Design a protein with these regions (language model features):
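Acidic catalytic loop of the alpha/beta-hydrolase fold
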Residues: 248-253
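Conserved HGGG/HGGXW glycine-rich cap/lid loop of the alpha/beta-hydrolase fold
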Residues: 43-98
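Gly/Ala-rich beta-loop-alpha elbow adjacent to hydrolase catalytic centers
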Residues: 129, 133, 137
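Catalytic active-site module of serine/aspartate enzymes centered on a nucleophile-bearing elbow/loop
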Residues: 268-301
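Short beta-strand/loop motif that positions the catalytic acidic residue
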Residues: 238, 244-246
């Protein structure tokens, strides 16, 4: 693992002395917790599905524009619920949630998320987002800044237009909109290979593939269009503790994207997970969970 908070490289076994070992071991030997609970809540006429597990400070998990919440975050629902109330939602147009209306942009997603948190009685929560979920976490901070006590941005962008060269951002949106009109097989075939490193175990990849095959065309289209926005203006104004986590084999959000966010967000901490791709929380769950746990301990001690 590389901890670039101070511009230095640190091996996982050396991170904060023996503390990283203690954190990862805790994931294995922690006290038993209840099975995740599947629930549904209505927000502004939309049925929003989610799973939650554990007790303690709230940790809300936002998935990418492919897959669903429980599949994307299973290892965090299991691995962090000994200490946190972990909530993984299905965004409108994903998983078991209903599709959004037409012209449902990034601000609408952020407002829906704020309404979701309100329905759950969460005045403030640690908010973690993967890829599109990271963009959504930033949009939530921009429109409802009092809802996030800490941000964890994994494989995230300041929107595609805010983090990628213009031609790359435009091509990515064109591809996504074309895939939304195609078959599930074409959708999975085009995107799944870009989500993981070449060393990803087939069994784990197959689980993620199954969730991708159940994609909602309208929801995927809405999330792709929301992902294409530019939220760079927010970054210098972020005033909550922020952790950036990226896989060092990520071909979708490369290190240049990570470093640009670290530079723009004052006091942010950047951790690289070795040999992990875009869905780094799935590919390196123990390292990801350890980094999150340590960050939340440090930022609220």
């Amino acid at each position: 693992m590389l901890d670039l908070a101070q511009g230095r490289s640190v091996a996982p076994e050396a991170l904060d002395g023996s503390r990283f070992h203690w954190i990862c071991a805790k994931l294995v030997r922690s006290k038993p917790v209840a099975e995740p609970l599947m629930e549904m809540v209505e927000v502004d006429g939309l049925q929003i599905a989610y799973e939650r597990a554990g007790s303690g400070p709230a940790l809300v998990l936002l998935h990418s524009y492919v897959g669903d919440g429980p599949t994307t975050w299973r290892r965090q629902l299991d691995g962090l619920s000994d200490e946190f109330t972990v909530v993984a939602w299905d965004a409108p147009g994903a998983g078991r949630s209903t599709d959004p209306p037409e012209r449902f942009g990034l601000d609408a997603y952020a407002d829906c998320l704020a309404g979701f948190l309100d329905k759950l009685g969460l005045d403030s929560a640690h908010v973690a987002g993967l890829s599109f979920g990271g963009i959504l976490a930033l949009a939530l901070q921009r429109r409802h800044s009092d809802t996030s006590s800490a941000l964890i941005l994994a494989s995230a962008y300041a929107g595609w237009a805010g983090s990628l060269p213009p031609d790359v951002a435009e091509q990515r949106l064109r591809q996504a909109l074309a895939l939304a009109d195609g078959t599930p097989e074409a959708f999975v075939g085009a995107l799944l290979p870009t989500m993981f490193s070449k060393t990803m175990p087939r069994e784990t990849m197959d689980d993620f593939r199954a969730s991708m095959e159940e994609f909602h065309p309208r929801g995927f289209r809405a999330m792709a269009q929301a992902s294409a926005e530019d939220v760079r203006d927010l970054l210098p104004r972020i005033d909550v503790p922020t952790l950036l986590v990226y896989g060092d084999r990520d071909v979708r959000a490369p290190l240049t994207v990570a470093k640009a966010l670290q530079t723009a967000i004052s006091g942010s901490r950047l951790v690289l997970l070795p040999d992990a791709g875009h869905v780094c929380n799935v590919e390196a769950p123990n390292e990801f969970n350890g980094a999150v746990r340590e960050f939340l301990h440090d930022s609220h001690s």
